Regions:
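Conserved alpha-helix/loop element of class I SAM-dependent methyltransferases that forms part
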Residues: 2-19
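Class I SAM-dependent methyltransferase SAM/SAH-binding core
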Residues: 23-67
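A short acidic, Gly/Pro-enriched loop at the edge of an enzyme's catalytic core
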Residues: 66-78
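A short SAM/SAH-binding and catalytic strip from SAM-dependent methyltransferases
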Residues: 77-91
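A short glycine-rich, Lys/Arg-flanked "PGG" loop and its adjoining helix->strand segment in the class I
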Residues: 93-105
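Conserved beta-strand signature within the Rossmann-like core of class I S-adenosyl-L-methionine
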Residues: 106-114
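C-terminal alpha-helical "lid/dimerization" subdomain adjacent to the S-adenosyl-L-methionine
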Residues: 114-163, 169
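Core SAM-dependent methyltransferase catalytic element
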Residues: 163-184
C-alpha cells in the first residue's frame, strides 16, 4: 500500500468563537471541536470506536451525517473537521441537504478539509496537521483515507450550492481548505 502524506498544514481554530449550539460531524477521534467548545458540542460519528476515543466533553452520539436525527432548524453551527473526505459523492450530497435542514436560519456551516488532486497514484491520502485548538493546546493529528477521487473546495461547491448555502469565506492552499457557509 502506498501513502501520500501532505506537508504539515498549520490550522489555528483558537480564535474562532461559535455562538449557540454546535453539531460536529465526524466528531470522534481527536474530538477537535469538543476540545475547543466543550459542552456546547454534540459530536456525531458513524463509528462507535472513534467516539470512544474522544474526550468526554459535550454529548457524543453514534449517527450517520446523511440521516441526522434532529429537529429542523435546531443548531446554530455545524462543523466538519476533515470529515467530508471520508464521504462518497452520494453521502456528500445527502449531508449538505441534511445540514441545511437542521441549521437555523443564518446558521453557519464550518468546513476544514483536505485538498486531494484527481491524480490518485497512491492508495492512501494522509493529511497531516499542526493544529492549534487553544493558547495551551496544540496537537498533530493525521487523517488518512483511501484515495479514489478529487476532493477540493471547488469540487464540493456543486453540493453546497445545490443545498442553497451561501459562501461567506474561503481560504485554501494546495493541500487544505476552509469554508464558511451560511444558511439563508
Amino acid at each position: 500500500m502506498e501513502y501520500y502524506e501532505t506537508s504539515r498544514q498549520k490550522i489555528n481554530i483558537s480564535n474562532i468563537h461559535f455562538s449557540g449550539r454546535i453539531l460536529d460531524i465526524g466528531g470522534g477521534g481527536e474530538g477537535v471541536i469538543a476540545r475547543h467548545s466543550k459542552e456546547r458540542v454534540v459530536a456525531i460519528d458513524i463509528r462507535a470506536d472513534e467516539l470512544a476515543e474522544t474526550p468526554d466533553l459535550g454529548l457524543k452520539i453514534i449517527m450517520d451525517a446523511c440521516n441526522l436525527q434532529f429537529l429542523d432548524e435546531y443548531f446554530d453551527n455545524i462543523t466538519c473537521f476533515f470529515s467530508l473526505m471520508y464521504m462518497d459523492l452520494t453521502q456528500i450530497d445527502r449531508f449538505f441537504s441534511e445540514a441545511y435542514r437542521v441549521l437555523k436560519k443564518d446558521g453557519i456551516l464550518w468546513i476544514w478539509d483536505a485538498t486531494m488532486p484527481l491524480d490518485c497514484s497512491n492508495d492512501v491520502f494522509v493529511a497531516q496537521l499542526d493544529l492549534t485548538i487553544s493558547e495551551n493546546e496544540v496537537i498533530t493529528p493525521g487523517y488518512g483515507v483511501s484515495w479514489f477521487r478529487e476532493h477540493s473546495a471547488e469540487f464540493i461547491e456543486q453540493f453546497y450550492i445545490k443545498a442553497k448555502f451561501e459562501q461567506l469565506e474561503l481560504k485554501q492552499n494546495s493541500e487544505s481548505f476552509f469554508l464558511k457557509l451560511r444558511k439563508n
